[in-house]
């Protein structure tokens, strides 16, 4: 972990001092890191690609609205992202080099880059269907359009 990553992480309400920060996953949009703390908890640190998401405030407000709704509807707390706030209560950090956010890491979870079996396809469909069902009553008009005309 370099000094810059450490300085970024110290701005968030983590359970303890960051002990490690390593690149994580194969994302194509944001830069993602797995963070472990001295307290044993893990987090996901992401540098948001503000060239793709020009309205970072709107993006983060969308995430807050959707995760709050899902948390009220879902019987499984592991199925909903937990956003970690900055020490001044914000959902993301604006630094000299861009925008950063932190989520609690979901232990024993996986993220497939490509389904390998029929079961992978099935579980992906179940997850997506459950997500859609839980959002059925969500007031979509509250969401910001963070990438203009993306859905057109």
Which ranges hold each PLM region?
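Juxta-kinase regulatory segment immediately upstream of eukaryotic protein kinase catalytic domains
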Residues: 1-22
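Conserved ATP-binding subdomain of kinase catalytic cores across diverse folds
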Residues: 20-43, 47-152
